[in-house]
Design a protein with these regions (language model features):
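C-terminal transmembrane helix pair
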Residues: 36, 52-55, 77-81, 178-237
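Alpha-helical membrane segments and immediately flanking helix-loop junctions
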Residues: 2-64, 158-173, 182-205
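Alpha-helical transmembrane segments of multi-pass membrane proteins
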Residues: 9, 117, 121, 125, ...
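Hydrophobic alpha-helical transmembrane segments
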Residues: 11-12, 43, 70-74, 127-128, ...
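Membrane-embedded alpha-helical core segments of multi-pass
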Residues: 20-22, 48-57, 78-86, 90, ...
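Selected transmembrane alpha-helices and immediately adjacent juxtamembrane segments
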Residues: 73-149
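Transmembrane helix-loop junctions in multi-pass membrane proteins
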Residues: 57-67, 137-150, 169-177, 196-205, ...
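Hydrophobic alpha-helical segments of integral membrane proteins
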Residues: 1, 8, 29, 104, ...
Length: 237
């Protein structure tokens, strides 16, 4: 199996099932030597994305109440798709140095138990970070209210970038033009939020994962998504 096919598999599964599957698969494949460790930050940034069902059902239908012009909102996936195509083109002739023959099916309950426990550990950690950063995302708003801040809107937007699920709800509840709400939601979906970054770092613990590269890539994709969203707004609306 070539490295290109493994990276493509990681990206597709990450897009379908959503965060943090992309980072988890990247970490597992890198630990086994199936993917070059130099690509882990890039592949994680590309594959570690919110799933299409989350974007369509929660962000678009439930929060933004949008039933048309889905192409505008799906631009949050476009930069990662472009980056993935470029990455596959660069690695198209590289393959795994070691090929492991497939073994016959054996039901090993120890492996099943270990898989279940590892899955629960990841799930509980994910839920814990979501709860923690959902609380943290409200702190800037609370501070602004207590201090009688003249710019409460800025505090709300800053808080929204801590945890995306809660942040989208915050943005959609602001008294701002609808176009600006949509652009901010696109930025949140592409960037992922501070919570996603901390969770990604925890998945790659003790591996030398360079978080700053991941953050820079996510920020670049967020900016590009916003620009594409504005361009599509001008064309379609």
């Amino acid at each position: 199996i070539s490295q290109k096919h493994i990276m493509l598999f990681t990206y597709i599964i990450g897009i379908i099932f959503g965060f943090p599957i992309g980072a988890k698969l990247t970490a597992d494949f890198c630990s086994k030597g199936y993917i070059d460790k130099n690509h882990r930050e890039i592949l994680s940034a590309l594959a570690n994305h919110f799933s299409l069902p989350f974007i369509i059902t929660y962000a678009l239908s439930e929060q933004l109440n949008i039933c048309s012009h889905y192409s505008i909102y799906l631009v949050s996936l476009l930069p990662s798709a472009i980056g993935m195509i470029a990455m596959l083109s660069i690695n198209k002739n590289r393959s795994l140095k070691q090929k492991i023959p497939a073994q016959g099916f054996k039901l090993n309950m120890q492996i099943v138990d270990a898989g279940i426990m590892k899955g629960f550990e990841t799930l509980i950690k994910l839920c814990g970070y979501i709860v923690l950063f959902s609380i943290v995302s409200r702190i800037p708003q609370t501070i602004a209210q207590k201090a009688d801040c003249s710019m409460p809107l800025s505090a709300d937007i800053i808080g929204a970038f801590f945890e995306t699920t809660n942040g989208i709800g915050i943005v959609c509840g602001l008294c701002i033009p609808r176009t600006l709400s949509i652009v901010l939601c696109i930025a949140l979906l592409s960037f992922g939020g501070v919570s996603c970054m901390v969770q990604t770092k925890s998945i790659f613990r003790d591996t030398g994962f360079r978080l700053y590269r991941y953050i820079l890539l996510k920020a670049a994709m967020s900016i590009l998504s916003c620009l594409l969203c504005i361009i599509l707004f001008c064309i379609l609306i």
